[in-house]
Amino acid sequence: RVRSNYMRGGNPGLVLRPENVRQVVDAVGYARRNPHLELGIRSGGHGISGRSTNNGGLVLDMGRMNAVEVVDEASRLVRLGPGARWRDVASALQPHGWAIGSGDYGGVGVGGLVTAGGLGFLSRHHGLTIDNLRAADLVLADGSQIRASEEENPEVFWAVRGAGANLGIVTSVEITASPVDQVGWAQLGFAVRDVAEFLEAFGQVATSAPRQTTAFLIMGP
């Protein structure tokens, strides 16, 4: 059984765990030769859609392609494997005084979040994760390998920043990290009687706060 997110799970017939790009190409070839098999691509398994798993099909688990590498210290350019978890990225960048905006939970995989947007606690000041994406390497459905950036395959680069799951399998990404010093975090609880009034007040506070402050709201019964 392969869990997809907090609510979904699946029982795929076959799970492949590539360790390099060549094995990803081979896996794509297998999927192409067996079109009757549903295909899921799994980085961390937290996608809300649940498409990273299935029942009876093929799941390509990218978890072993989890490298975190500083490419260029001066420009803070970092290369990440799609299977890396954001907690590991944060731990690797912390000694440099850097961070990448990466959602709100460390167990999320790089591949899914970085191709879908990436809204997190640093977003108001440093932008979405895709705003800092500089390049992505992909394996396409025909097994070919391409690199997408503003200079190479710019139309693919435009699309991979938000719709990457529709284009191919990302095998690595290059992202510019941001210099981040001390970070403050607080979680507050409120007993709310007038929900409409509270939401209006929260909206005013969130939008008027300094850009260094990001506010999230979770409501429950």
Where are these regions (language model features)?
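Short active-site loop/helix that positions an aromatic residue
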Residues: 27, 89-95
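Short, structural beta-strand-to-alpha-helix junction motif
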Residues: 20, 76-77, 84-91, 107-110
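Glycine-rich N-terminal segment of FAD-binding domains in flavoprotein oxidoreductases
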Residues: 2-66, 74, 80-82
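General beta-strand structural signal in soluble alpha/beta enzymes
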Residues: 17, 39-43, 60, 70-71, ...
